[in-house]
Amino acid sequence: EHQIFTRRADFPNLKNYIGKSLVVTDGLTLLGGDDKAGICEIMEALAYLVAHPEIKHGKIMCAFGPDEEIGTGADHFDVKQFPVDYAYTIDGESLGQLEYETFNAAGGTVTLKGVSVHTGTAKGIMINCAKLAMQFDALLPGAAVPEHTCGRQGFFMLMSMETQVDTGKMNYIIRDHDKELFEAKKAFFLQAGQTLNDIYGREVCEVSVKDQYYNMYDVIKDNMECVNVAKAAMEKAGITPLCDPIRGGTDGSKISFMGIPTPNIFTGVENL
């Protein structure tokens, strides 16, 4: 109907599902199975346990939180109301994924301050914020962007930009798995602002950085029981655990630093 196709050339993982039934969306929304699949799986698991009391288990607690996709899902999570030894977010992707390494993450804001005058008398006076934005972005390493990095390589990403001649604002995200490299990237970002100010001999930009979440591995590495239990459960079900670092984060990143080690488990979705 909408001529939207998921092609194997673009998503090679599709070959793993030949002959299997797929649940798909219409392709018109930002999110597909993320994280509708996780909610369904949690509720189905609870329903199954209720229907089969012969299955012995300890105390199980579940929580559902909004706003994970904008990085604030765990901001008001009350760990006192969730007395567990460890937890799992059900927010992963393909079969077998078990993730306990995330990015360290920060947001960067650049406020631009230009000078607007009539174009006829602009020589030596006008400072165009659109040009400032391009200059600032050019000061960041061109290869350290999402489209040129993979694995544990971090990046800067310009998320949005709005400029007029005399005002402007740029919003970035800054990511790295390694804490030292993360701190170095934040310092580099702030220095880029100072460099631009030095070029113009005046304050043409104001730069700020705010941490968003940290690599859960720094907590989980000393609490590996949650990972080992999940691995054993998958292997018992004939599933091979796939433990790769997440090039992103989950609510489990923040919850882990609140005192509850919380790795992430697959939901079975592809092309979120």
Regions found by a protein language model. Name each.
Residues L46-P53, D137-V145, G193-G201, M234-G238:
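Structural signal for hydrophobic packing residues in well-ordered secondary-structure cores
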